[in-house]
């Protein structure tokens, strides 16, 4: 499928007379795509260049040889295993909130650590700006989504970054870079390689390429936003296709609810939908603790999301649906 209509949102347009058109594009992207690209998002190109440099150098120095050894063993045994259960990627994970583990990751030099800390702060700010834009689009009080995400005992979201490399694969017809899945969390910000493609999303039954654009940030709607919006926004199946040439860098940052935050459809949206349809209020999704969902997701990541939502109904918690204060 052609990617020419893929939604690209220029955040500069949100500041002027073209704001209504830009907000309409944002709504369409969240409701009908689940994934879109941001330009002029406020993170400097200089910082993004440093992030790319330090991570590609880290992979070359410390992870490339390890992956080659893993790949050799994998290719030797691929005939005897189910390739649909394999991912052709080299990854490590940085935690930022509620506590950071950057100082504990082996082999990261000081430049890499400080660069990634700086990048994480910028991404955290961008995620929160985007959440407020989504509140505006949805007709929710400003700050509502952040308040839900920070509704756990420590008053913080869960925020972390998955740093991935997808090296050349000699048998891309057998092994995916990363198998198809939706993301479990809230809002995902991806800084992807602009020289090597591979990211695809499922749109109208067809896989469509997400075009690499230099210095853009790809935004992905996670399962929790689907729940909070009572299905108005949708998380989307996406995957990474292994390539025979080029090493693809992918830096995905996940701004998620706190582990014990309670997730449920926003009452204002449920009521609004009922009024528009002139029917009784109906919460399509259950109320649950985010960590309970994650515990299930870890086992069911590469399966359909709908059974996960259904499974959460069996442990649905009883709670008051009073408005969440945002001030």
From Swiss-Prot:
Q: One MF term in GO for this entry?
A: metal ion binding
Q: Known PROSITE patterns for this protein?
A: FE2OG_OXY
A biological process term (GO) from this entry? ethylene biosynthetic process
What name does this protein carry? Answer: 1-aminocyclopropane-1-carboxylate oxidase 1
Q: What EC identifiers does the entry list?
A: 1.14.17.4
Keywords in alphabetical order, please: Ethylene biosynthesis, Fruit ripening, Iron, Metal-binding, Oxidoreductase, Vitamin C
Catalytic activity of the protein = 1-aminocyclopropane-1-carboxylate + L-ascorbate + O2 = ethene + L-dehydroascorbate + hydrogen cyanide + CO2 + 2 H2O
What class does this enzyme belong to in the EC scheme?
A: oxidoreductase
Using the chain's own numbering, where are the disulfide bonds? Answer: none
Signals that turn on the gene: By pollination.
Give the UniProt family note: Belongs to the iron/ascorbate-dependent oxidoreductase family.
- Annotated residues that bind Fe cation are located at 181, 183, 238
One short Pfam family name for this protein? DIOX_N
Pathway field: Alkene biosynthesis; ethylene biosynthesis via S-adenosyl-L-methionine; ethylene from S-adenosyl-L-methionine: step 2/2
The gene name reads: ACO1
Q: Locate the Fe2OG dioxygenase domain: which residues? A: 157-257
| InterPro entries given in the database record | DIOX_N, IPNS-like_FE2OG_OXY, IPNS-like_sf, Oxoglu/Fe-dep_dioxygenase_dom, Plant_2OG-oxidoreductases
* Entry cofactors: Fe cation
